Amino acid sequence: MAEEKELVLLDFWVSPFGQRCRIAMAEKGLEFEYREEDLGNKSDLLLRSNPVHRKIPVLLHAGRPVSESLVILQYLDDAFPGTPHLLSPANSGDADAAYARATARFWADYVDRKLYDCGSRLWRLKGEPQAAAGREMAEILRTLEAELGDREFFGGGGGGRLGFVDVALVPFTAWFYSYERCGGFSVEEVAPRLAAWARRCGRIDSVAKHLPSPEKVYDFVGVLKKKYGVE
């Protein structure tokens, strides 16, 4: 029974949203049980746990479900305050901390609204619409690089380590190769500092353990193309 475990994650191997949760729990040193979902035949547990959206990831904490990856990340900060924070701790009356939290949330939302959406269109489209999506993706990556600046990590929790934005964005680095192949550009050329950040993150144990290889992701994209008749 999932309710007997402290933390259980209902997930799918290639989902960047589920990977966020896995990386966050690894960064916090939290042990959890991973349960792979068949998205073509979703489990009763998943459907009961997320009846509104009926999708992964879902975190079960002592049997209580928490849905939506960015919500889960913030929940982990709140539920396990003794672990490293992804967001700057909320201190009453601390305007700087409040601003840092708001900024981190903005950029995590940007990743979901812009990068994920554009990435999905890249493999679904053909011809000039696909090329236009490739140009859009290049601009999105440049925008993220500008926000990163000369910092080692985006931060959000402080301390020169992975923060909220890093954990939100880093799973998509496993998709960079697919974006390049579909969009006709090079991440290294359009956003070299962001590419360096991706390599730096990839050397961190919590990231390396939970991200699939770019080649495996590209193979999965090929399966999706065939499934939806794109090829």
From Swiss-Prot:
<feature type="binding site">
    <location>
        <position position="15"/>
    </location>
    <ligand>
        <name>glutathione</name>
    </ligand>
</feature>
<dbReference type="InterPro" id="IPR045074">
    <property type="entry name" value="GST_C_Tau"/>
</dbReference>
<feature type="domain" description="GST C-terminal">
    <location>
        <begin position="97"/>
        <end position="220"/>
    </location>
</feature>
<feature type="binding site">
    <location>
        <begin position="68"/>
        <end position="69"/>
    </location>
    <ligand>
        <name>glutathione</name>
    </ligand>
</feature>
<dbReference type="InterPro" id="IPR010987">
    <property type="entry name" value="Glutathione-S-Trfase_C-like"/>
</dbReference>
<dbReference type="GO" id="GO:0006749">
    <property type="term" value="P:glutathione metabolic process"/>
</dbReference>
<feature type="binding site">
    <location>
        <position position="56"/>
    </location>
    <ligand>
        <name>glutathione</name>
    </ligand>
</feature>
<feature type="domain" description="GST N-terminal">
    <location>
        <begin position="5"/>
        <end position="84"/>
    </location>
</feature>
<dbReference type="GO" id="GO:0004364">
    <property type="term" value="F:glutathione transferase activity"/>
</dbReference>
<dbReference type="GO" id="GO:0005737">
    <property type="term" value="C:cytoplasm"/>
</dbReference>
<feature type="binding site">
    <location>
        <position position="42"/>
    </location>
    <ligand>
        <name>glutathione</name>
    </ligand>
</feature>
<keyword id="KW-0808">Transferase</keyword>
<comment type="function">
    <text>Conjugation of reduced glutathione to a wide number of exogenous and endogenous hydrophobic electrophiles.</text>
</comment>
<protein>
    <recommendedName>
        <fullName>Probable glutathione S-transferase GSTU1</fullName>
        <ecNumber>2.5.1.18</ecNumber>
    </recommendedName>
</protein>
<dbReference type="Pfam" id="PF13417">
    <property type="entry name" value="GST_N_3"/>
</dbReference>
<dbReference type="InterPro" id="IPR036249">
    <property type="entry name" value="Thioredoxin-like_sf"/>
</dbReference>
<dbReference type="InterPro" id="IPR036282">
    <property type="entry name" value="Glutathione-S-Trfase_C_sf"/>
</dbReference>
<dbReference type="InterPro" id="IPR045073">
    <property type="entry name" value="Omega/Tau-like"/>
</dbReference>
<dbReference type="InterPro" id="IPR004045">
    <property type="entry name" value="Glutathione_S-Trfase_N"/>
</dbReference>
<comment type="similarity">
    <text>Belongs to the GST superfamily. Tau family.</text>
</comment>
<dbReference type="Pfam" id="PF13410">
    <property type="entry name" value="GST_C_2"/>
</dbReference>
